[in-house]
Curated annotation (Swiss-Prot):
GO terms for biological process: DNA biosynthetic process; thymidine metabolic process. Homotetramer. Gene3D superfamilies: 3.30.60.20, P-loop containing nucleotide triphosphate hydrolases (3.40.50.300). ATP binds at residues 9-16, 85-88. This is Thymidine kinase. It catalyses: thymidine + ATP = dTMP + ADP + H(+).
């Protein structure tokens, strides 16, 4: 019986490389998968899942008007699993489409992404994944500044100063965001 999985973690917790590992495991057994990623993620190139260790793979980009269910249903070869990177950028409608893939097409769906933004607010996609997922798993990483578990994401400006207000979505990597614990989110030991 297929299920909807949500695997979340702070920045740098290995979400993208986990997608590539899962895809490889299926494909080694001659079981095709379908990989999607947000069309908003332009850090590397639109339509790619890229990990910080240098591995990358083509993926179907999701835009606001993308109907993920229709795309999967129209595939000539049914995938054994659907993998979604950057699930936090999805809309409620997208998440409902993922649930429909599981419930109607009986295909497992694994969504990977951030749970909360730099203000410690839920992303829309993450909120609805938390509500609709059958299984939820935290992917752990350590705080950039201390030894505690990172549960938040700290955004910094060009001078390295922490930012706590602004637009929720700003695409960036290690130069813009740090995985941090709660204490270091409030009082980051940054030298400016």
């Amino acid at each position: 019986m297929a299920q909807l999985f949500f695997k979340y973690g702070a920045m740098n917790s290995g979400k993208s490389i986990e997608i590539l590992k899962v895809a490889n495991n299926y494909e080694e057994q001659k079981k095709p998968v379908l990989i999607f990623t947000s069309g908003m993620d332009t850090r590397d190139e639109v339509g790619y899942v890229s990990s910080r260790v240098g591995l990358r793979r083509r993926a179907v980009p999701i835009f606001d008007d993308t109907n993920i269910f229709d795309y999967v249903e129209s595939c000539r070869q049914k995938p054994y699993c659907v993998l979604i990177d950057e699930v936090q950028f999805l809309t409620k409608a997208h998440v409902l489409q993922l649930a429909n893939i599981v419930d109607t097409l009986d295909i497992p769906v694994m969504g990977f992404g951030l749970k909360n933004d730099f203000r410690n607010e839920l992303f829309e996609g993450s909120k609805y994944m938390l509500l609709y997922a059958d299984k939820i798993e935290e992917m752990k990483t350590i705080c950039w500044f201390c030894h505690k578990k990172a549960i938040m994401n700290l955004r910094v400006d060009e001078q390295g100063k922490p930012i706590y207000d602004g637009e929720q979505i700003q695409i960036g990597g290690n130069e813009t965001y740090y995985p941090v614990c709660r204490k270091c989110h409030q009082h980051p030991p940054l030298t400016v």
